[in-house]
């Protein structure tokens, strides 16, 4: 009988923990700062500071064992670390791990949070993601409806469950990580790097950096931009006019930039949000679709 009562108590405790809810908010005095509040085991913890910068959001280091005395963080994944994507560093909050949905879009993997980087405004219902102790997993509801935050591990996107949607309704440019072959004076140059498309006017692309970039610019006398201020990093870039792309440097059977085109199995980013999969670019409508 005692064991049955203990079992019921444990189940009830788990149900209470399953109601854990995180909230992200700002204060009037500090508009650039964000905070998290969370009720844990009946105790509401406020003002867990998140700092924000060009790289996005991350939790400032706290003594989590002091904040959550009923939980052990010795073996949990509450560590803030830095990753590098496209030569930019982004801070990863490795607190949530698992699978979640935004509308019809399903992501699997770690979550990192970037400011205003994803054109979804939705409440994310996250299940079995947060490991507050060595043995307990809680169900957490995250409501970022006002903040427009993004969460995706670029190496763990389940592209089979992605529906087509317009991602340039908010942002006019995209960075795509692709290998590109350029024909110039009878030679072929394989440039492996990142390509930035400005689709609002479809006039320029920049391609940077690559194994052969310096040599390519030296021999072809293509203009090389020495410093490009992208908040987090400076890099070298080639800048082309669209006519040159269509006629000389990018023949149609490589990148038909004057027409709509698709890019398969590529990485892409839109203002910091990273995607892996297929892109379809409609230059007439100035739209880009992620398939």
Predicted regions and their residues:
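Pepsin/retropepsin-fold aspartyl endopeptidases
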Residues: 19-291
